[in-house]
A protein has these predicted regions:
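Histidine-centered catalytic micro-motifs
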Residues: 37-44, 68-84
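Hydrophobic transmembrane alpha-helical segments that form the core helix bundle
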Residues: 1-62, 66, 126-135
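Residue-level signal for short amphipathic helical patches enriched in basic/charged
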Residues: 31, 84-87
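Short, exposed beta-strand "edge-strand" segments with a Pro/Gly-rich flavor and a Y/T-containing core
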Residues: 55-60, 78-82, 100-107
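Non-catalytic, topology-defining segments of multipass membrane proteins
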Residues: 1-20, 86-135
């Protein structure tokens, strides 16, 4: 709290938004982005299964969102190979994409699948999104 108050005072003193933009506001817009992106990773999918392709989703983001999210949109790949650095996840995806379910295109593509599934799960808690996984 003291840091935020000090930042607000510094912004008023220097008549600049920069201290707020770099210290206080990232907490708000950063958490919002993490929530929006994070929900795409597992919502509506199976739980407690050993094959991460059934419990995790990869979503192709635009370059800005991908950078902000450390390329963690390749989430199946991250779960299957957790020691691969985030900057190598796109390369890993290219190597194994023929063994993966289809990647969702953007947040819209992910939420188009997630929202109906969550509605179905509110009525049937055992419902899980069926995935087409290559053999």
């Amino acid at each position: 709290v003291f840091v935020w108050v000090g930042t607000i005072i510094a912004s008023l003193y220097f008549q600049s938004w920069l201290p707020l933009l770099f210290i206080v506001l990232p907490n708000f817009y950063g958490k919002t982005l993490v929530t929006i992106f994070g929900a795409t990773q597992h919502a509506g999918l199976k739980e407690d299964v050993k094959d991460h392709r059934h419990s995790t989703r990869s979503v192709l983001l635009n370059p800005v969102f991908s950078f902000l999210y450390w390329q963690m949109e390749y989430h199946i790949e991250h779960h299957m190979f957790p020691t691969v650095p985030s900057y190598n996840l796109p390369k890993l995806h290219e190597m194994i994409k023929d063994q993966m379910p289809p990647i969702r295109k953007g947040l819209y593509g992910a939420y188009k699948e997630i929202i109906p599934a969550l509605i179905k799960q509110s009525k049937d808690p055992h419902y899980k999104i069926p995935l087409a996984i290559p053999a």
